């Protein structure tokens, strides 16, 4: 299993899709190689970028195999992107679209292409989910995808007896890594696109044992009272800090959820909390490295990583080469600088705290926003909270935004914080809003804290605080 075509061809997995069809992974490998031959006839050449804006379906997997077989590069395009966002990504990568209807008719009549792509070839481009600037273009070679699939399968304890649901979008590392790990372990794979009702029904019907997703996804399943009792391990990404109780709620429903860590540059499922640990431990993002060849260090609070899952570099404008200068700025002596604040637990285990840019610097101390948000979420009627810091003449001051359908008594909220937090952590304002500004990504919806800071600055300027 040295490259992506072999990952499919040598897997014992059977893959079930939303339309009811079931295909072996080997069938998908054959069909993908036929699709590669058809794409060659359409003028695609080794190194060309293909824009893939597809749901989780068989076509998506065939085209991923086709890219690997022919040496094309798959550019993952979020299905929720607007036309302007698609045009920007396609322009920056020089990616070409695929005429899918013609391809469905054409590839069936083609002889499978003898794969020419190698494990060292560029394979897939993910976009980072930055909330303050244009997304960076993260390039992975086949090598990092396949090697990490094997490591993640081992780290999650997957085997051919397991049933894995692949529900996160394949256009992001969370979805693709969950899929490839299942292929590496020859699991039965249930491919679907998330809907709180139908996904819950499918988990019960297929007796899914493993599924990875965002905290919001599991929250919505639990709200629907989905039967999750078959889930022995669900890795969850912590994108919504207001859902701190998600692990305990899932346990009450018979499912084991556990925190993990990953990002596009090192892929999802880079580390995992012990599923046998208690709910408090499993609720903490981070965990133990899944690869024996991976390592981490913490420098001035920043998490830095090495390992076989590491990306090849950030793609340059135009898509043909790696931007060496941009890539080098994110490395320190061979260690990838994540931009995340973390704390060491042992040589193989760490706890993710926050994005360094999101950490509040208050009263001369670093404060994780979640520390204040947790107190605010104790208030009856407060569904969620986000806290940012605003620079004032007397120093940085915290400002809180809450989602409270029936409103919130700001004075009471501030007094509550004063009883439980040091004075410098107490928000100077607690503002109720209808929803947090956010940006979608293939890995989960992320709150735009930069916009919250602008809103906070405007609120303080208006109030004179």
What residues fall within each predicted segment?
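Conserved AMP-binding/adenylate-forming core of the ANL superfamily
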Residues: 13-43, 51, 55-57, 61, ...
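Conserved AMP-binding A3 loop
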Residues: 24-26, 123-147
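Flexible, low-complexity linker/hinge segments
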Residues: 103-122
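Conserved AMP-binding/adenylation subdomain of ANL enzymes
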Residues: 146-163, 170-210, 265
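Gly/Ser/Thr-rich phosphate-binding loop
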Residues: 209-213, 222-281, 295
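AMP-binding/adenylate-forming catalytic core of the ANL superfamily
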Residues: 211, 307, 341-425
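Conserved ATP/PPi-binding loop(s) of AMP-dependent carboxylate-activating enzymes
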Residues: 288-292, 300-329, 367
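Conserved C-terminal "lid"/linker of ANL adenylate-forming enzymes
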Residues: 360, 386-391, 399-401, 418-465
